[in-house]
Protein backbone atom coordinates (compact mmCIF):
# COMPACT_ATOMS: atom_id res chain seq x y z
CA UNK A 1 0.00 0.00 0.00
CA UNK A 2 1.32 3.42 -0.93
CA UNK A 3 1.93 5.92 1.83
CA UNK A 4 0.29 9.33 1.87
CA UNK A 5 3.57 10.96 0.85
CA UNK A 6 3.42 9.16 -2.48
CA UNK A 7 0.55 11.41 -3.55
CA UNK A 8 2.18 14.74 -2.77
CA UNK A 9 3.52 15.18 -6.29
CA UNK A 10 1.28 13.01 -8.45
CA UNK A 11 -2.43 12.52 -8.95
CA UNK A 12 -3.98 9.24 -7.77
CA UNK A 13 -4.98 6.72 -10.39
CA UNK A 14 -8.68 5.73 -10.45
CA UNK A 15 -8.11 2.65 -8.32
CA UNK A 16 -6.13 4.63 -5.75
CA UNK A 17 -8.64 7.42 -5.12
CA UNK A 18 -10.68 7.42 -1.92
CA UNK A 19 -14.36 6.48 -2.40
CA UNK A 20 -15.88 9.54 -0.72
CA UNK A 21 -19.61 9.62 -0.01
CA UNK A 22 -22.94 10.37 -1.66
CA UNK A 23 -24.06 12.95 0.90
CA UNK A 24 -22.75 16.51 0.62
CA UNK A 25 -21.02 17.95 3.66
CA UNK A 26 -23.24 20.15 5.90
CA UNK A 27 -23.14 23.80 4.88
CA UNK A 28 -24.38 27.01 6.49
CA UNK A 29 -25.60 28.74 3.35
CA UNK A 30 -24.80 32.36 4.24
CA UNK A 31 -21.60 34.23 3.40
CA UNK A 32 -20.12 35.58 6.63
CA UNK A 33 -18.85 38.76 4.98
CA UNK A 34 -21.60 39.84 2.58
CA UNK A 35 -24.63 37.80 3.69
CA UNK A 36 -25.25 36.30 0.26
CA UNK A 37 -25.92 32.56 -0.21
CA UNK A 38 -22.98 30.24 -0.83
CA UNK A 39 -25.03 27.74 -2.81
CA UNK A 40 -27.87 28.44 -5.24
CA UNK A 41 -28.97 28.86 -8.84
CA UNK A 42 -27.33 32.31 -9.16
CA UNK A 43 -29.53 33.28 -12.10
CA UNK A 44 -28.07 36.11 -14.15
CA UNK A 45 -24.62 35.74 -12.60
CA UNK A 46 -21.45 34.07 -13.88
CA UNK A 47 -19.33 31.47 -12.10
CA UNK A 48 -15.73 30.27 -12.21
CA UNK A 49 -13.51 28.14 -9.97
CA UNK A 50 -9.95 29.18 -9.09
CA UNK A 51 -7.25 27.16 -7.38
CA UNK A 52 -4.23 29.11 -6.16
CA UNK A 53 -2.92 27.38 -3.08
CA UNK A 54 -4.49 27.32 0.37
CA UNK A 55 -8.10 28.34 -0.12
CA UNK A 56 -8.32 30.40 3.08
CA UNK A 57 -6.33 33.32 1.68
CA UNK A 58 -7.46 32.72 -1.88
CA UNK A 59 -11.12 33.18 -0.98
CA UNK A 60 -10.42 36.51 0.73
CA UNK A 61 -8.71 37.80 -2.41
CA UNK A 62 -11.93 37.36 -4.36
CA UNK A 63 -14.58 38.37 -1.83
CA UNK A 64 -12.79 41.74 -1.70
CA UNK A 65 -13.20 42.31 -5.46
CA UNK A 66 -16.09 44.71 -6.22
CA UNK A 67 -18.65 43.00 -8.41
CA UNK A 68 -18.15 39.57 -6.86
CA UNK A 69 -21.51 38.43 -5.50
CA UNK A 70 -20.37 35.52 -3.37
CA UNK A 71 -17.47 33.15 -2.80
CA UNK A 72 -17.11 29.70 -1.28
CA UNK A 73 -14.27 27.26 -0.75
CA UNK A 74 -14.32 23.65 -1.77
CA UNK A 75 -12.62 20.81 -3.55
CA UNK A 76 -12.57 20.28 -7.31
CA UNK A 77 -10.73 18.62 -10.15
CA UNK A 78 -10.34 15.20 -8.58
CA UNK A 79 -12.20 11.93 -8.29
CA UNK A 80 -13.56 11.62 -4.74
CA UNK A 81 -17.18 12.81 -4.32
CA UNK A 82 -17.92 15.00 -1.29
CA UNK A 83 -14.41 14.65 0.09
CA UNK A 84 -13.44 15.93 3.53
CA UNK A 85 -10.52 18.23 4.25
CA UNK A 86 -8.45 15.43 5.75
CA UNK A 87 -9.10 13.25 2.71
CA UNK A 88 -8.03 16.02 0.35
CA UNK A 89 -4.86 16.60 2.40
CA UNK A 90 -4.00 12.91 2.02
CA UNK A 91 -3.55 13.50 -1.70
CA UNK A 92 -5.78 10.53 -2.46
CA UNK A 93 -8.74 12.48 -3.86
CA UNK A 94 -7.06 14.30 -6.75
CA UNK A 95 -8.82 17.51 -5.78
CA UNK A 96 -7.28 20.94 -5.56
CA UNK A 97 -8.41 23.47 -2.96
CA UNK A 98 -10.66 25.75 -4.99
CA UNK A 99 -12.63 28.97 -4.64
CA UNK A 100 -16.01 29.27 -6.31
CA UNK A 101 -16.42 32.86 -7.50
CA UNK A 102 -19.91 34.04 -8.45
CA UNK A 103 -19.83 37.46 -10.09
CA UNK A 104 -21.83 40.09 -11.93
CA UNK A 105 -20.33 40.54 -15.39
CA UNK A 106 -21.82 44.03 -15.56
CA UNK A 107 -19.81 45.06 -12.50
CA UNK A 108 -16.53 43.16 -12.88
CA UNK A 109 -15.00 41.61 -15.98
CA UNK A 110 -13.63 38.11 -16.18
CA UNK A 111 -10.33 39.68 -17.24
CA UNK A 112 -10.16 41.52 -13.92
CA UNK A 113 -10.71 38.28 -12.03
CA UNK A 114 -8.00 36.60 -14.09
CA UNK A 115 -5.61 39.40 -13.23
CA UNK A 116 -6.36 38.95 -9.52
CA UNK A 117 -5.80 35.21 -9.92
CA UNK A 118 -2.46 35.44 -11.69
CA UNK A 119 -1.01 38.16 -9.48
CA UNK A 120 -2.05 36.52 -6.19
CA UNK A 121 0.12 33.41 -6.44
CA UNK A 122 3.07 31.83 -8.24
CA UNK A 123 1.58 29.71 -11.03
CA UNK A 124 4.92 28.09 -11.92
CA UNK A 125 5.30 25.88 -8.84
CA UNK A 126 3.46 22.74 -9.91
CA UNK A 127 2.11 20.68 -7.03
CA UNK A 128 2.76 23.28 -4.36
CA UNK A 129 2.34 26.92 -3.43
CA UNK A 130 5.10 28.31 -1.26
CA UNK A 131 5.53 26.11 1.81
CA UNK A 132 2.28 24.26 1.08
CA UNK A 133 3.22 21.09 -0.80
CA UNK A 134 0.80 18.64 -2.39
CA UNK A 135 -1.51 18.13 -5.34
CA UNK A 136 -4.28 19.98 -3.49
CA UNK A 137 -2.29 23.22 -3.80
CA UNK A 138 -1.89 23.15 -7.59
CA UNK A 139 -2.89 26.16 -9.64
CA UNK A 140 -6.13 25.79 -11.60
CA UNK A 141 -8.83 27.65 -13.51
CA UNK A 142 -12.05 25.70 -14.04
CA UNK A 143 -14.23 27.52 -16.56
CA UNK A 144 -17.99 27.39 -17.00
CA UNK A 145 -18.16 28.81 -20.54
CA UNK A 146 -16.13 28.50 -23.72
CA UNK A 147 -15.52 32.25 -23.62
CA UNK A 148 -13.99 31.94 -20.15
CA UNK A 149 -11.81 29.08 -21.32
CA UNK A 150 -10.52 31.02 -24.33
CA UNK A 151 -9.84 34.09 -22.18
CA UNK A 152 -8.04 32.01 -19.55
CA UNK A 153 -5.74 30.46 -22.16
CA UNK A 154 -4.99 33.85 -23.69
CA UNK A 155 -4.26 35.35 -20.28
CA UNK A 156 -1.93 32.46 -19.46
CA UNK A 157 0.06 33.08 -22.63
CA UNK A 158 0.24 36.82 -21.98
CA UNK A 159 1.34 36.34 -18.37
CA UNK A 160 3.88 33.70 -19.39
CA UNK A 161 5.69 36.32 -21.44
CA UNK A 162 5.93 38.60 -18.42
CA UNK A 163 7.06 35.79 -16.12
CA UNK A 164 9.69 34.58 -18.59
CA UNK A 165 11.08 38.09 -18.88
CA UNK A 166 11.38 38.16 -15.08
CA UNK A 167 13.21 34.83 -14.87
CA UNK A 168 10.35 32.52 -13.91
CA UNK A 169 9.70 29.09 -15.41
CA UNK A 170 6.69 27.73 -17.23
CA UNK A 171 3.17 28.19 -15.93
CA UNK A 172 1.76 24.90 -14.64
CA UNK A 173 -1.83 26.07 -14.14
CA UNK A 174 -4.48 23.51 -15.07
CA UNK A 175 -7.15 25.17 -17.25
CA UNK A 176 -10.31 23.15 -17.92
CA UNK A 177 -13.70 23.48 -19.57
CA UNK A 178 -16.25 22.43 -18.66
CA UNK A 179 -15.60 22.96 -14.98
CA UNK A 180 -15.59 19.83 -12.82
CA UNK A 181 -18.02 19.37 -9.95
CA UNK A 182 -17.35 21.77 -7.08
CA UNK A 183 -17.70 20.05 -3.71
CA UNK A 184 -18.26 22.55 -0.91
CA UNK A 185 -15.78 22.32 1.96
CA UNK A 186 -16.72 22.10 5.61
CA UNK A 187 -18.26 25.14 7.33
CA UNK A 188 -15.09 25.75 9.32
CA UNK A 189 -13.23 26.61 6.12
CA UNK A 190 -15.83 28.98 4.63
CA UNK A 191 -14.65 32.61 4.94
CA UNK A 192 -11.96 31.32 7.29
CA UNK A 193 -9.97 34.55 7.46
CA UNK A 194 -13.09 36.54 8.33
CA UNK A 195 -13.58 34.22 11.31
CA UNK A 196 -9.85 34.19 12.12
CA UNK A 197 -8.32 37.49 10.92
CA UNK A 198 -4.86 36.47 12.11
CA UNK A 199 -5.15 32.97 10.67
CA UNK A 200 -2.65 31.35 8.34
CA UNK A 201 -2.38 32.74 4.84
CA UNK A 202 0.40 31.26 2.73
CA UNK A 203 -0.60 33.15 -0.40
CA UNK A 204 2.14 35.09 -2.15
CA UNK A 205 2.48 36.36 -5.70
CA UNK A 206 5.52 36.76 -7.90
CA UNK A 207 5.42 40.54 -7.97
CA UNK A 208 5.10 40.38 -11.76
CA UNK A 209 2.21 42.45 -13.12
CA UNK A 210 -0.33 40.72 -15.34
CA UNK A 211 -1.00 42.78 -18.49
CA UNK A 212 -4.75 42.10 -18.70
CA UNK A 213 -7.82 43.52 -17.04
CA UNK A 214 -6.28 46.95 -16.60
CA UNK A 215 -8.97 48.78 -18.54
CA UNK A 216 -11.75 46.22 -18.21
From Swiss-Prot:
Keywords: Oxidoreductase. One of its GO terms (biological process) is cellular response to oxidative stress. It is an enzyme of class 1 (oxidoreductase). SUPFAM superfamilies: Peptide methionine sulfoxide reductase. It catalyses: L-methionyl-[protein] + [thioredoxin]-disulfide + H2O = L-methionyl-(S)-S-oxide-[protein] + [thioredoxin]-dithiol; [thioredoxin]-disulfide + L-methionine + H2O = L-methionine (S)-S-oxide + [thioredoxin]-dithiol. Pfam families: PMSR (PF01625). The active site is at 54. GO terms for cellular component: cytoplasm. The keyword Oxidoreductase applies. This is Peptide methionine sulfoxide reductase MsrA. It comes from Xanthomonas campestris pv. phaseoli. The lineage of its organism: Bacteria, Pseudomonadati, Pseudomonadota, Gammaproteobacteria, Lysobacterales. The gene is msrA.
Amino acid sequence: MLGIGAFKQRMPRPGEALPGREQALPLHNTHLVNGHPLRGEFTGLAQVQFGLGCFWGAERKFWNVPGVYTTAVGYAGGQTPNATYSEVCSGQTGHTEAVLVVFDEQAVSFAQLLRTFWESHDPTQGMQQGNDVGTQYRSAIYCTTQAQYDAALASRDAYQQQLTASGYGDITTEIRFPAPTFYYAEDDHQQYLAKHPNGYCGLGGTGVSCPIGLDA
